[in-house]
Amino acid sequence: MNYPGTELELFAEATNWKRYFASKLRPFVRGRVLDVGCGMGVNANYLVGPTVSSYTFLEPDLQLLAHVPDHIDASLKKMSEMVHGTVDKLEGRQFDTILYVDVVEHIEQGPDELDRAYSLLAPGGHLLVLVPAYQFLYSKFDEEVGHVKRYNKEQMRSELPRWARPVSLYYLDSMGVLLSLANKFLLHQARPTRSQIRFWDRCMIPISRIMDKVL
C-alpha cells in the first residue's frame, strides 16, 4: 500500500502542532505502545515518555516504514519494532496504548478498524484517536490525501467500540478552522505550501492553545 500525496512530509515540520497534540495524548501513553499507521514515525518522539516500555510502529506502506529509523531518537530505537501491515497482522498480541494519529479518516470502515484494534488492547489500556474535525471543512486537500471524511464529536463517539468507555473527547486547533475555511472557499488548494504550514504552526497554533481553553 502506498500513501497518497505528500501530507506527511509537509506536516513533519509542524513541530508546535505536534507538541500541542502530544501534550494532550502523552498522559495516556504508557507500557506497550502500538502506533497504527505510523507513517514515517515523526510523531513518536513527541509521544514517548518514561512510562513507555516498548513501541511498535505499524504501517501498511513499506516505503514510509523504511524512513522510521531516520526520525526517531536512539533511545526509542532500542525499544521499538517495525511491522509492515495492518492490525490484523498483530492478532493475539496485547498493548497498553494504541495510537491512531491522523489515520482513521483514511479508512472506509472506521468502526470495524477500531473494533479490531480494541481486541488488542490490554485491560486498563487506552485507545487514542486523533482525526480532522468537521465535515463541512472537507476540501480538495482532504480528497488529495485520501481522507474519507472528517468527524465531529458525535460521529467519533458512534464509531468507537461499543465496549469502550470514552475518557475524553474534545476539539483542538480552533484557529485552524478559519484557515481551513479560507482554503475551502477561497484558495481551493489541493495541498498547502511549506510557507503556509509554517505560518499555521508558528503563528496560529500558539493562539489555538489559548483559544481552545475557552471555546
Predicted region positions:
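Conserved N-terminal segment of class I S-adenosyl-L-methionine
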Residues: M1-V101, P111-L114, T193-R194, R198, ...
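Conserved catalytic loop of SAM-dependent methyltransferase domains
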Residues: E7, V42-N43, S168-S208
